[in-house]
Amino acid sequence: MDDRPIVFFDIAIGGQLAGRVAFRLYSDLVPKTAENFRALCTGEKGLGQSGKPLWYKGSAFHRVIKGFMCQGGDFTAGNGTGGESIYGEKFEDEGFPVHHSRPFLLSMANAGPNTNGSQFFITVSATPHLDGKHVVFGEVIKGRSVVRTIENNPATNGDVPKEPVVIADCGQLSSDDPFLAERTSTDGDPYEDYPDDEDQELGNPETVLQIAKTIREVANRLYKQGDISGALQKYSKSIRYLDVHQELPENSPPDLNEQYKSLLAPLLLNSALAAIRIEPHSAANAMNAVANTSRALNRLELSNADKAKAYYRRGLAKTIMRDEVGAEQDLKTANELLPEDGAIAAELAKIIQKKKEQREREKKAYKKMFA
């Protein structure tokens, strides 16, 4: 198994590097399929029949279904209708020695029997209904959190990621590459990015609460150090752990529910703040901020000060999303809750002035039309 080839993807989401994923390929079980993927990672085969490089670099994940899989590899059309193998357009199913029994397996996408090209998918859960239909040819050995980030990136109704998920770079790694070395936590957070991948038993809500608190402390420290992007990742992670127990068991201690809520409120508000502070602004981060502030407002009992924070931050996020009407409504509500806050008043004045200038431009345009 040590001589199984290892390849990597460097993933960018919305133009920002999300991290590296490394795969070990089952060259001993399905050598032809594994070699196809390996060569498409290195780009060593040059141009294909389509006239485009036989290379995954620059191609995108065009289909992502949360709880199921992340699909990519169409470097010719980019939408799931194209792709090409190193052997020609299509090649046969080599065999089905490995079942889709767990997350983080690499499998060939196809259009029916013996139609393998370059498209692949990464499982994010067990998918036994695909056994005998799709060839499993590898597994993720590093970067599981990056795969989860792809999975949880917002998608359209057609399962297309709203923010492009691109293979910014790819290639082959030696078995002694530093990226593959075991890493210990250097920031005080030893936990997996997603609870489903955590080895520790999470059935006890008090255990999960303590994990979430630990991660929040790391997030706060990163924020104070100016690592806003890192802080957002940790705030989001802490929320994911709390969400393991959205409904607490009936026999839970009486104050445990309050402890959960008192931790969740600042996590939601702080994650929103971090999301709108990251430069350059992105629609994905703005949507994150809107979702978390809305959750805090709709599901938690907040003080007036925290309500004002939530409306203010949601208003800023809506401004980033160019939803000026929604932004003005939220900023007005925040201003009513906290009229002495200068920052809220300034943002509200700014958006009102912008609306006034827009009306003036429209008036001038109409005058020119009928002059």
From Swiss-Prot:
TPR repeats lie at residues 212-245, 265-303, 308-341. It catalyses: [protein]-peptidylproline (omega=180) = [protein]-peptidylproline (omega=0). Disulfide bonds: none annotated. InterPro entries: Cyclophilin-like_dom_sf, Cyclophilin-type_PPIase_CS, Cyclophilin-type_PPIase_dom, TPR-like_helical_dom_sf. It is found in: Cytoplasm. GO terms for molecular function: cyclosporin A binding; peptidyl-prolyl cis-trans isomerase activity. Belongs to the cyclophilin-type PPIase family. PPIase D subfamily. This is Peptidyl-prolyl cis-trans isomerase D.
